[in-house]
């Protein structure tokens, strides 16, 4: 049953892309033209289901899916040269709304979602439009409140 539901959700998402009504086409355009700090958030598209977060390092974008349906896209800032954001599949290990870095002089890491125990997390931070972090994935403050 799980495979059937997954295929159905995936096919539904693909179907929307192929049929692309004007409103959906506008959303796709908006995703490509987001400026640093901008995001879209539409939780009503899929009110329940497992959540997956995909970080595109080349595009400096974070995509949030719930129940196999994309509900949000945001700009981000990943690791700068020498501090690259690791790639792979991670589980959120810890959440802390008011976290402070133990590595970088108590630097604030609002709405922190820890990915590794050696300091990699999703959190709110500065978004210059290019990779600039020490390996974390920086998000807009308001977007980080939803993740």
For the regions a language model picked out, list residue spans one by one.
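N-terminal pre-domains immediately preceding structured catalytic cores
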Residues: 2-112, 117-147
């Amino acid at each position: 049953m799980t495979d059937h539901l997954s295929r159905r959700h995936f096919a539904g998402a693909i179907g929307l892309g192929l049929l692309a009504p004007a409103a959906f086409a506008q959303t796709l355009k908006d995703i490509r033209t987001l400026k640093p700090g901008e995001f879209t958030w539409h939780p009503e598209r899929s009110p329940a289901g497992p959540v997956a977060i995909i970080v595109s390092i080349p595009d400096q974008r974070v995509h949030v899916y719930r129940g196999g349906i994309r509900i949000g896209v945001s700009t981000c800032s990943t690791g700068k040269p020498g501090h690259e954001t690791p790639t792979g599949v991670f589980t959120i290990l810890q959440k802390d709304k008011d976290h402070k870095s133990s590595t970088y002089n108590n630097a604030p890491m609002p709405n922190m979602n820890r990915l590794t125990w050696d300091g990699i997390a999703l959190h709110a931070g500065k978004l210059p439009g290019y990779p600039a972090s020490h390996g974390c994935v920086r998000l807009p403050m308001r977007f980080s409140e939803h993740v």
